[in-house]
Amino acid sequence: MKKNQFANKLIVIDLLSVQRESFYSFLTEGLAKELNNFSPIIDYTGKLELHLVTNQLVIKKPKFSFEEAKRRDCSYTISINIVTQLFNKNSGDVKEQEILLGEIPLMTQKGTFVINGAERVIVNQIVRSPGIYFNSEMDKNNLKTFNFLIIPNRGAWLKCEIDKNDLIWIRIDKNKKINLSIFFKALGIDHDDLRIKNAFRQPEFIYKNLNKDENYTQQEALEELHKKLFPGEPATSEASTKILYFKFFNPKKYDLGIVGRKKINKKLDLNSPENIRILTIQDILSGINYLINLKFGFGNIDDIDHLANRRLKSVGELLQSQISIGLIRLERLIKERMTICEQSSLVPSALINPKPIFAAIKEFFNSSQLSQFMDQVNPLAELTHKRRVSSLGPGGLSKERAGFAVRDIHPSHYGRICPIETPEGPNAGLIGSLAIYARINPDGFIEAPFYKVNQGQVLKNKGIIYLDAEQEDEFKIAPGDIRINETNFIKEINVPVRYRQEFTQCPAEEIDFIAVSPIQVISAATSLIPFLEHNDANRALMGSNMQRQAVPLIFPERPLVGTGLEAQIAKDSGIMAISRSNGIVKFTSAEKIIVTDSSNNQITYNLQKYQKSNQETCINHRPIVWPGERIKKGQILADGSATDTGELALGRDVLVAYMPWEGYNYEDAFLISDRLVYEDLYTSIHIEKYEIEARQTKLGPEEITRNIPNVGENSLKQLDENGIVVVSSFVESGSILVGKVTPKGESDQPPESKLLQAIFGEKNKDVKDTSLRLPNGTRGRVVDVRIFSREKGDELAVGINYIVRIYVAQKRKIQIGDKMAGRHGNKGIISKILPRQDMPYLPNGTPVDIILNPLGVPSRMNVGQIFECILGISAFNLKKRFRILPFDEMYESDSSRILINQKLKEAQTLTNLDYLFNENHLGKVALFDGRSGEKFDNPVLVGKIYMMKLVHLVDDKIHSRSTGPYSLVTQQPLGGKAQQGGQRLGEMEVWAFEAFGAAYALQELLTIKSDDIQGRNEALTAIVRGKTIPKPGTPESLKVLMREIQSLGLDIAAYRLPNLHHGEIKSIEIDLTHNKIVQKR
């Protein structure tokens, strides 16, 4: 691929702008807008007014830096102060004060929030846009009925429907149906009103509906409406009069939003000003007119899944609605205080309490479905999490009720939401990812970039034009992978296009727009898969998701075969240290880099060393500049975890062979060489946090000390004089990390202490050892120790004197049971590690690193891995790296195959390795068995593939139990590693025992080895005394089942039937509701 062509297909954008721009607009506009809606507050008597001066909003800097907030386990927040004025209309006094309104978490440069020391992300929510929606449904008689629904931003929903008898009904908030005639009367519209005549295309259809209830007055109609909406409440004339005003015409209770107003104006062809955000009578009349026209075959029904009807709520808007909730609570509080307190002595600070706003913000960040603990396994996982789009959450869908239509890929998703990247399982289709070049417009609709096309010529010099889904429907749009000549004219005569959600063909002269790049359809993670177009979509989905689970390695390596987006994604993830100005590097070390800029100012870049991520992987910076080097603004100073010279590096390129090997790679298992273990190719660092608190007890304070009773000097050698482990110590299971003693009372004394005291009158030490020890199965090096105490000014909970945190880093080499995967969804578990001398080897003696099963390719249809494999070995031998954008068939037919064959031939010519290129079986090599030295019968595909080690490590999964906790109800062992649980002998295992006829083994497993309490105690006694094990009794779970049946009023017990030689067994059916007995024979 030519370099200039490649560059033309990539446009540079900021992948985190979605989060940053939304939060910035909230701080600069949204917050003030919300406060303006709230001000002024007038008390119930109308004598006091509280005004918020929003143009004097003061935002104060955070108390701690972002790093310090994480270290102290507190939130990284800004304080919002506002100038308030209290007007007393009786005395004419005006009191002015600056007041703290609340604290709001501040977004970091990486688009995250620090809440209680943990980084969190606010996910973008995709919801139905406010506006008017027309729909058709089939009723129970299979007749087509029409309806419309007006959805506001805030307030009641209004639904209008035409039934099979051509009668029009109104529903407010899914309540009972209301006759149109009563609704019009309540609105003050008479039957002979001119507005009816002017608003309707078919006025006779309306008059047929209105002549039903002519004798109602407006007051009676309002009272009738009140009865329907609030059944059981008295319909007083005062309450009835206000009902419609509060539902649809009060700006404080009802808000269409600017978007809702625009959508209604466009759909109904109205020109109401955008600042009228309540419903108008004109909106209702025009809506009913459109509905009647639909009945007569005019107009269009709306597609609810079209992205023109769904908008994105990003962090700024979600926060704004949360502030609104807090302000509503605050308003109620202020009005109460205005009534209770003495008016003459009132000041604004006595009225405003920041707690309601604090609480609303805290509730949102700590417990909302959209505020999530950041996925921090690697830089790609972070970036993808911030670009995620969710249909779930408040005001959205729930995964239980969401049907297939909502989850499906819609034509309007093209270039906006990735059709590939979505979770597997119950959330499939409900959670997506923004396409790589998509952006959000101010109204919250997703836009995609295009070039204008004029008479078959692509006008690249005119720049990029962004269109939303609604605008796009009106144009003929060509995909990004059609061929264009040097003068930017489209080569093809007939071009595939999208037009009004259909895929069709048209001449090049009729095309209006063309996509800017073939990859604009897919998300950031999917765009990292080379030869994507040769993979089945299901496997591409797995490949996208598994890249996010790749563990950062000690020695990261950028891929030989990539797509060219690795550098952009690594840079935008915020994981690397990037220069903020031009200058010269003055000093570099593992801890910091000092740069002198053009104004001779020194800028210090502090580097992160062995920091723990949210998923316990290691965040670490490695400097890649040297003293004296001249640097430019935006240049990378230090690589982060999983990056290599500024490019994303999630795995390693290894030599693989596709062949079966003694059944060890059956069913997706992998065989690996011990070279991967000994050379630390797949070694990663994982950091775990261990914490201990020293509390104030009734018997005195707990002490952190080196003087621990009954502990030898050997166990204390790694502790300092305060009893805390020294940084850089190597610790193993059972090692003391923090020495702690707790005072104990007389009753806690063991019998031997009481005996000594009785004989010698000595008092044994009255403390017990409660030290923090390293748990079983863990070892590593202490990388950090943090001590929190009140003396240092740390905020600790009541009753806690000290907190000590120890961070232990473990090096985890690759081992049997670990999960590995490529970028094409080719995943597997390591089943065996072979010595490198036993691995199959190439004719030049090079042993392969991994043996994959060839049967994993045909049925999965992820052929991209074969292309990568062959191009990878060519790249390795040519000492080059290849960057191949997906959908490269635009250059010529079969271009991927031509390219890999061409590069393989070049590699053979350059290296003189004849086995590399064999025309009879391209890409395949005659391999030799490492054990016997004999050649294998058939040639084998050998190449270089980029393989990753995933976060599903066997060390975290493997678990055993001897004795442990039991469930209180069933008396069976608990399940799961966290509960120290056992392995369940389930239904299928029972079948296996039954199939073998192992009746006694099965009986034991289901009774005395499980939940027959009495039986297991008797069995233990019998074993101890050498007697015969008695027969098992009744399992506890059967007793539980019997109790449950008995609780339903059914007496269940075992009865012995009498020996009936000639009689019959009678079956009696009892109808419990009628007390009748029906006898059956």
From Swiss-Prot:
| Predominant cellular place of this UniProt entry's protein | plastid
- EC top class, as a word: transferase
Q: Which Pfam families match?
A: RNA_pol_Rpb2_1, RNA_pol_Rpb2_2, RNA_pol_Rpb2_3, RNA_pol_Rpb2_45, RNA_pol_Rpb2_6, RNA_pol_Rpb2_7
Tell where it localizes.
Plastid, Chloroplast
Oxidoreductase as a keyword of this entry, yes or no, is: no
Q: What is its EC number?
A: 2.7.7.6
Q: Which UniProt keywords apply?
A: Chloroplast, DNA-directed RNA polymerase, Nucleotidyltransferase, Plastid, Transcription, Transferase
Q: What domain of life?
A: Eukaryota
What Gene Ontology molecular function terms does this protein carry?
A: DNA binding; DNA-directed RNA polymerase activity; ribonucleoside binding
Keyword Transcription attached: yes
Instruction: Give an example GO biological process.
Output: DNA-templated transcription
- List, alphabetically, the PANTHER family matched: DNA-DIRECTED RNA POLYMERASE I SUBUNIT 2 (PTHR20856)
Q: How does it assemble?
A: In plastids the minimal PEP RNA polymerase catalytic core is composed of four subunits: alpha, beta, beta', and beta''. When a (nuclear-encoded) sigma factor is associated with the core the holoenzyme is formed, which can initiate transcription.
Function (record text): DNA-dependent RNA polymerase catalyzes the transcription of DNA into RNA using the four ribonucleoside triphosphates as substrates.
Family label: Belongs to the RNA polymerase beta chain family.
Protein's UniProt name: DNA-directed RNA polymerase subunit beta
Query: What organism does the UniProt record list as the source?
Result: Cyanidium caldarium (Red alga)
Q: What high-level taxonomic lineage is stated for the organism? A: Eukaryota, Rhodophyta, Bangiophyceae, Cyanidiales, Cyanidiaceae
